[in-house]
Every structure is written in C-alpha cells, then in structure tokens.
C-alpha cells in the first residue's frame, strides 16, 4: 500500500492499553483516553484491554481509515517488545512506520507507582501529553535497504560451531567453518563419556566431524585465526590466517561459537596435577584405565561462585556425578565422596542421575564457602553443615571441579567483531530472553559456551538456534535495517570541526574518517543510540527520530509551553 501523505494537517490518534491489570488495575484507562482527546492535534482516542491483540490492532487500522490519522501514539507497555508490532500495523494502513510513537505507561508508571494510583494517573497524563507533542514533530524515514551475500562464517569448530555450520550448509548457504586448533571437536576430543547416557565422547564427536567433512557448501579451515573483520550485516569481509597464509572470505552473517576454557586451579586445595587433579584430567585417566585409588574425594565449586568468579559453571555437578558413577562401575570397592556447596541437577533426567549416585553408595557432604575444606597430605578436613562437626577423611585421589572460563582471546575477537563482553569476559547477547542468540550488532549471532557455560546438549541446541537466526538474514536477497540512525546532513557538514570525538565514542564503530578527511556515518552499522550526537560540540550530527525539535517539544509541553 502506498504511504499516506504525512505533511498534511497533523491528525493524531491515541490508543491507551489496559495491559490486563498491569495498567488498568492501577489507573483509569478510559479517563486517560478521554483526557487524550483534549490534547492539541488529537482527533481520536480510545482505550483497549490489550492493544497488541488482534482486536486492538484492528481497532488501530480502523481508526486510521475512518479518521484519516497520520500519526499514531500507543500508551502501553514497552517498545522493546511491542514497537515492531505497532509499526508493522500502521505500515499496513499506508503510514510510514516512523510516524508512530510509543509511550510507556506500564514500566515507567504503573509498575513503579502502583501504590500511588492518583499520582500515577497524573504522571500518565504527562507522558501521553509529551508523547503526543513529539508525535506531531515526527517525520517519515526510509528504511535502509542492504543487499545480502548468502554466505555464513562460523567461528569455532566445537560441537556448537559444527552444529551451526552443518545446519547452515544443509539449508543451501555457503558456509565457512574456522577453527584455531588443528582439529575440529574442541573439548569433546579429550572427554571420556557424556552425561547423562554415558555415550563415548570420541565416537560422538567423530560422527559429527565426519558429517562436517562430507557436507556440501561447507569449507573447513583448521589451524586458522581471524585477523580482521570489516563491513556490516549482509556484507562482511573477513581476513583469516592459516599457517602464516592469509585468506580473504566474504559472508552475510557470522556465528560466534568459540567455546570456553578450563580453569587451572593453581594454589587451590593443593592442586599438583598428580594426586590432586581436575575433573578434566580425571577424564583422561578414566579413558586410559589409570585409576587405582581406593579413596576418592571430589570438591565442587573450586574457583567459582566466589568473589573472583561469582557465577555457577552449571556443568561441574553433572560432570562430577558422571565421573563418580564411572569410577564405581570400574572399581566397585572404591569409596567415592563429593563435597559440595549446592548440587545443580536440573530436569528429571539429571535428577535421576543424582539418585543413581546415592544408590551406588557415593557420599555427599555439604560444606560452606566460609569454612572451606582443608586439604592435607593424605587426608582432608571438612566441616559438615548437617551435623555441625568437623570430619576427617583419607584420600588417595583428590578431584577438583573447576569452572569453564572465558577464552583469553575473547577481548581481541570482540574488538574485531565490534561486539560486547560481559563482566566475566564471556560474549554478551543482545537480550537474555528476547534475543538470546543475537548480538546487539545486526548480522552476528552466538551459540554455545562462548556466552556462558553450557553442557553438550545445550551447546548443540544453541548452535542450531544461532544458525536459524542467521538464516533469517541469508534467506533474503535484501533486508531493511533501522532508519532511525545518526546522520551528518550536507547542510551541517560545515559545522563539523573534525575533532573525531564521535569516532571514539561510537560503540558500534559506525563512524569513520574518509580519505578526504570528512566524517562518514555508516548507517547500516548505526543503531541510533545517540552517543555521537550528544558528544558533538558543534551540533553537526542529527539523530533521526530524536531530533532537537522532537525532544524539545516534549520538554516544553511538560512545562506547559509549546514550540
């Protein structure tokens, strides 16, 4: 449908959502809609139980037709989840999607002021008045069209990366799989059995590697590191290095599945790599039938869930249970004990694993972070929380359950990809619930323990999820990306002093200096965060959809004036 004329007299429609009882249970939404009708340029207003429902969306479309609306304001929940829905709704009726304004009267009003409904109602009136004032100043914007290169780059040849690469190649996309080690498989190459079914790790990973090597549309580069990445969603140029040889690749989407590393517990519980070893080292001994110990003690949460690493590694408990059960199968007379702070066995299958361990005679003793076990030459002292006494146990073999930690080169790769890391140097997804496989940077996706410690099953699932997200881009010849970006209009270029502050502060690396020393904003990379505009001392940069007149109109109308 062709877009409606937006430069005629402004006609605003306001739609107030009850959001069930989230908003309607605190303030009078009908009265709020009636108030909206009194505002300048508002020609229609109504309230809905759920504006995002089919009925609510149909009501918006009907009002646009019947009242010739050319601006729409929805006062409801949060734009993070629902703005795309309402933009699509008005677009179907011929309005430019940027002639829509979202007013959050739930998160910013009724949720935080639920005990003060009278004051919340007055604040909601202010928010709608301000949102309507901005809507009057809105201008139509064009979405940016980008041509897509239907190829994918997967960084990391572990189980998550291989799963992702196989999925993409089977969908018909040219796929490049990059692995820095000389063999695919990652940590699976060194494990013995996989929980909870105790499948042989080598057989499992070799089958996946065989599928990768025989796959069509899939090129594998082992002993290869990423050296440089340029471009944006749909058009990435990647330089990799394999055995000192540089190779140039191009891709439309990138999947990051570089996995994680294992903590070496130096200076923790007397670790020596011989009698006091890690679970990872125990796997090798079990595979080679090198376990002869009679008294075996395992300590959980070694180097994790503390001030230095406050997170739970999630796989350590199940790994300990698995290895303890294998030891009991190999050496039935062995005394196996697990010292734990908390046991993490989610789901019925994993809980059943724990029950099996108890039935096999494996002992569990809970210890406290403030009273850590004391490891001596051939015995260990532990304060038993349940009986309130210190207990002494002999050991022939002490096994330390250490966490998965972020790779040392994550920072370097994050800088190349222009994506963020979280506080523990794992990669940070765009949103843990809404966009768990995406980065904030369009066209780059993540899976496996690169973003957080996960087990094999979860790593495979996340690898497929990342491939699925990447395919939503690669399956199109062109895509539209955000139009509300920063810009340096021609009429403002004489204001630019070339200070380059905008280049330094841009978190998406969307601004660069050209060969002619002019500032250039790559709109396909820009997310419209506004940092550059806020730091530009000469006001040369314009933030589309958040222009000075639009923001000032909200401020002035809040104070009882207009601009």
What does each model-identified segment do?
Residues 2-12, 142, 189-214, 218-219, ...:
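Flanking helices and flexible, charged tails adjoining ferredoxin-like Fe-S electron-transfer domains
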Residues 2-12, 158-161, 337, 341-375, ...:
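Mid-to-C-terminal Rossmann-like scaffold of FAD/NAD(P)H-dependent oxidoreductases
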Residues 3-69, 73-74, 78-109, 150, ...:
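Beta1-alpha1 glycine-rich phosphate/pyrophosphate-binding loop at the start
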Residues 77-80, 169-183, 187, 218-221, ...:
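Iron-sulfur cluster-binding cysteine motifs and their immediate structural context
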Residues 205-261, 321-409, 513-514:
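A Rossmann-like FAD-binding core segment of flavoenzymes
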Residues 4-9, 55, 65-67, 110-115, ...:
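Rossmann-like dinucleotide/flavin-binding elements
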Residues 16-26, 121, 125, 154-169, ...:
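Cysteine-centered iron-sulfur cluster-binding motifs in ferredoxin-type domains/subunits
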Residues 139-155, 159-160, 189-203, 232-247, ...:
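Ferredoxin-like iron-sulfur electron-transfer modules
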């Amino acid at each position: 449908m062709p877009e409606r004329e937006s430069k005629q007299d402004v006609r605003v429609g306001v739609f107030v959502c009850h959001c069930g009882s989230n908003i309607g249970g605190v303030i009078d939404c009908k009265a709020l809609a009636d108030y909206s009708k009194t505002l300048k340029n508002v020609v229609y207003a109504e309230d809905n139980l759920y504006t995002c429902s089919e009925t609510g969306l149909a009501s918006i479309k009907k009002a646009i037709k019947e009242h010739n609306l050319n601006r729409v304001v929805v006062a409801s929940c949060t734009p993070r989840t629902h703005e795309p829905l309402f933009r699509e709704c008005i677009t179907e009726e011929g309005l430019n999607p940027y002639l829509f304004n979202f007013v959050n009267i739930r998160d910013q009003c009724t949720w935080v002021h639920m005990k003060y409904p009278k004051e919340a109602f007055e604040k909601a009136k202010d928010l709608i008045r301000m949102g309507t004032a901005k809507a009057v100043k809105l201008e139509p914007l064009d979405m940016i069209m980008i041509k897509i290169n239907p190829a994918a780059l997967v960084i990391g040849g572990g189980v998550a990366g291989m799963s992702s690469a196989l999925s993409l190649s089977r969908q018909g996309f040219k796929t490049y799989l990059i692995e820095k080690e000389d063999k695919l498989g990652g940590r699976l190459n060194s494990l013995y059995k996989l929980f909870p079914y105790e499948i042989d790790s080598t057989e499992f990973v070799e089958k996946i590697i065989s599928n990768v090597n025989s796959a069509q549309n899939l090129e594998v580069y082992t002993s290869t590191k990423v050296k440089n990445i340029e471009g944006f969603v749909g058009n990435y140029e990647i330089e990799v290095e394999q055995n000192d040889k540089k190779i140039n690749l191009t891709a439309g989407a990138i999947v990051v599945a570089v996995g994680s590393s294992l903590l070496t517990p130096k200076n923790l519980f007397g670790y020596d790599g011989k009698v006091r070893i890690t679970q990872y080292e125990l796997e090798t001994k079990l595979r080679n039938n090198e376990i002869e110990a009679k008294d075996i003690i395992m300590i959980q949460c070694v180097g994790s869930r503390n001030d230095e690493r406050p997170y739970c590694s999630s796989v350590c408990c199940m790994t300990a249970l698995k290895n303890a059960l294998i030891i009991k199968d190999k050496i039935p007379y062995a005394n196996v004990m697990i010292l734990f702070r908390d046991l993490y066995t989610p789901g019925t299958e994993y809980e059943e694993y724990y029950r099996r361990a108890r039935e096999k005679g494996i002992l569990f003793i809970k210890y406290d972070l403030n009273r850590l076990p004391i490891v001596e030459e051939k015995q260990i002292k532990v304060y038993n929380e349940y009986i309130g006494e210190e207990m002494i146990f002999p050991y022939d073999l002490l096994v330390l359950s250490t966490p998965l930690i972020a790779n040392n080169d994550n920072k370097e790769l994050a800088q190349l990809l222009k994506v963020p890391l979280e506080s523990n140097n794992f990669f940070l997804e765009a949103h843990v619930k809404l966009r768990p496989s995406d980065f904030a940077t369009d066209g780059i996706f993540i899976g496996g323990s690169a973003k957080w410690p996960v087990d094999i099953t979860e790593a495979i699932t996340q690898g497929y999820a990342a491939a699925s997200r990447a395919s939503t881009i690669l399956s199109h010849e062109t895509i539209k990306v955000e139009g509300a970006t920063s810009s340096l209009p021609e009429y403002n270029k004489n204001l630019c002093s070339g200070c380059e502050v905008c280049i330094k502060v841009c978190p998406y690396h969307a601004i660069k200096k050209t060969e002619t020393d002019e500032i250039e904003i790559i709109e396909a990379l820009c997310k419209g965060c506004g940092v550059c505009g806020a730091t530009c001392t000469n006001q040369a940069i314009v933030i589309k959809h958040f222009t000075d007149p639009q923001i000032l109109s909200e401020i002035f109308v809040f104070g009882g004036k207009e601009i």
